[in-house]
């Protein structure tokens, strides 16, 4: 029996001819990632294990993005600990205030991760890089510590689910609608410890940003990882960024999948995940009138330049609704700068939105937009659990940037076509 894309990457890095689901393997890593929340725990474990060196200073990335710029003394202390570790071990890819971005937007942008890589990160949304045809997954801080020291990690080879993408998305429907549609279909445990493998003729109609968004939320379906077939769009993106050679892994024609889903992109409508689970999805006709207090456009899911562009298009010459707050967060400094160059920031500010420096901030209820009791927020982030963005009685509605921007203008949950 043949292997899937994920299985081929794992077999290669484990030095094996083949692997099967449920095999336990040790595999060599191409990148180990941590942030300002998870890295301090990894550093403590690193020291407790009495490790004396890192395996490769060029294959570790530390990104201060969650509570940065530091929101309080504890956050500052954690960042200082990471800063000292990066200096002591001469870590090449250390990003702090000034060059920092939201990690899962920053690493692909900078070419630090690329096609065919095996990546672990002490952050659950590390699965984002599967958009590039990499095997990428989140781990705990202890595994991060061992990875930094040895360059290896253990894996249980996952079973696979295949998603055949067909057709083309409608105007103002994007990758966020696709992944919310899928999660609504299979549930938050529908891909539990599985690899979600995306391909099909519809792939050519999805941008890299669409794919990054979709892969980012594979974890919200319980997946071990999400991974996309590599095509000309992927290769063009990678060649413009990475300085490393890369290898493309293609699934065998006789690869085995537990399930196969055909996803008709043409039929997907604006989709929103209602509180308090990403699987609690509703399409536009079923939304009803939901009055909102806040909109957040940004995060590792939807803080990329294309997201800023569509938000600016919708907000151009419009005004944020009275009694509605709109917070926009470009995910990296380069995206922020390009927003300035293209006039997006002027559009946002004239509309009545506030623009933040890159940060994860409100997504995890950290800072830059915490919700009070009973407040409702439309957000382009990836989780809407109870209390995720603030008070336990607040509500988070997960949406695309298109829906978020339209909702900010009307003050109620809306789609772009609802704006006169």
Swiss-Prot record:
Keywords: 4Fe-4S, Amino-acid biosynthesis, Branched-chain amino acid biosynthesis, Iron, Iron-sulfur, Leucine biosynthesis, Lyase, Metal-binding. It catalyses: (2R,3S)-3-isopropylmalate = (2S)-2-isopropylmalate. The keyword Lyase applies. [4Fe-4S] cluster binds at residues 300, 360, 363. GO terms for biological process: L-leucine biosynthetic process. Binds 1 [4Fe-4S] cluster per subunit. CDD domains: IPMI. One of its GO terms (molecular function) is 4 iron, 4 sulfur cluster binding. Its cofactor is [4Fe-4S] cluster. Transmembrane segments: none annotated. Pathway: Amino-acid biosynthesis; L-leucine biosynthesis; L-leucine from 3-methyl-2-oxobutanoate: step 2/4. It is an enzyme of class 4 (lyase). Its EC number is 4.2.1.33. HAMAP family: LeuC_type2. NCBIfam families: hacA_fam, IPMI_arch, LEU2, PRK00402.1. PANTHER family: 3-ISOPROPYLMALATE DEHYDRATASE LARGE SUBUNIT 2, HOMOACONITASE, MITOCHONDRIAL-RELATED. Belongs to the aconitase/IPM isomerase family. LeuC type 2 subfamily. Catalyzes the isomerization between 2-isopropylmalate and 3-isopropylmalate, via the formation of 2-isopropylmaleate. Heterodimer of LeuC and LeuD. This is 3-isopropylmalate dehydratase large subunit. The lineage of its organism: Bacteria, Pseudomonadati, Campylobacterota, Epsilonproteobacteria, Campylobacterales.
